[in-house]
Amino acid sequence: MPQIFGRTYSALELGRRIGRPEQLGGIREFTFRDGRALGVRAFDVSSGAGLRFTSLADRALDVCSLEFRGIPLVWRGPGGIAAPQYYQPGDDTFARNFFGGLFTTCGLGNFGPAGVDAYGEFGMHGRINHLPAEHVAARTVWDGDSCTFEVSGTISEAQMFGENLELERTLRVELGANTLLLRDIVTNKGGTRRPHMLLYHCNMGFPLLDLDSILEVSHRSLRPRDEQAKRGLTCWNRGGDPDPEFAEQVFIHEPLACADGFARAMMINRTLDEGRGVALVIRYDPKQLPALFMWRMLGVNTYVMGVEPANCPTIEGRVEAAKRGTLPMLEPEERRSYELSFEVLSGAAEIDRELASYAALIAADSTGPAALGS
């Protein structure tokens, strides 16, 4: 049963108190009508418990904004939202059209730098996040006393004589809850095996990211990508002041699953919500996404900390992944599923309970050295 404003109600009890479910939460479909976002279809979804997000149907149903009780939790890129027609496979297109948001999907054939190989040319972080969804649907589903808001669609990344990959995507949130569930299924609809690289570029920003913020990660190991990242090893998971001279730092993690099978990354700011504290927890299955990259970029305007679960441990892109023997491939008609959840925690009790629970699970792991990043 949904919990609304601190009290649990049955469907019958709620129905007696409201005219329509939208009085509490729901899905609103709209279209942008200005600038480079002109014509982009979108869904605004409210859980009725303080969680609100926007999914862009014409940008692979990626989530461009996330708020909790009116507090923005994610970074928005300076280029804003751009319609799919602004995509070009050059090196700078991703940066020009990168809206940031809760997550931008990188793939399906590549993440990392642009390049060319035996399978063809590919752009930085792939093409999928610039493709519009089809068969898009928004539903409100009652099952007994629980109510779920659901947005779904199919995104096709295909060309003649090339790849034919399909992404089936579903976003779900329950009425009265503060957890967004994401389920993706990627299928190779073509007749030949194809490269399949997938990364979820999750982007936490101000005010969740600020001077006193800290990112906690369940991992077995951590290493810097390069010399620049080495300089930030002592504060890799901390916020700080925006610095116009800041150079990006990327850290490579080996994820560790807790007893429930999911690895975690949690950004905490204990000063938000009038001092009660707010945290954003990202959970993912390391069997599906065995790599995690963390992007620390405390620049001016580009003030963001990225958490990036991926299905390949090679951040340097498809050409390098093939050289190292780490390039994932999809056989004809092969399907792979990916599940992530994004939960907002409010107050010291909820935050400390989450920290204590998976810290204990990590400490109990006996398969090798483990750590809760801090």
What role is predicted for each listed range?
Residues 1-181, 193-195, 204-241, 254-374:
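Surface-exposed acidic/polar loop and edge beta-strand patches at domain peripheries
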Residues 201:
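An amphipathic, aromatic/His-enriched active-site/gating alpha helix that lines ligand/cofactor pockets
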Residues 244-246:
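Extended intrinsically disordered or low-complexity segments
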Residues 249-250:
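Surface beta-strand/loop "capping" patches
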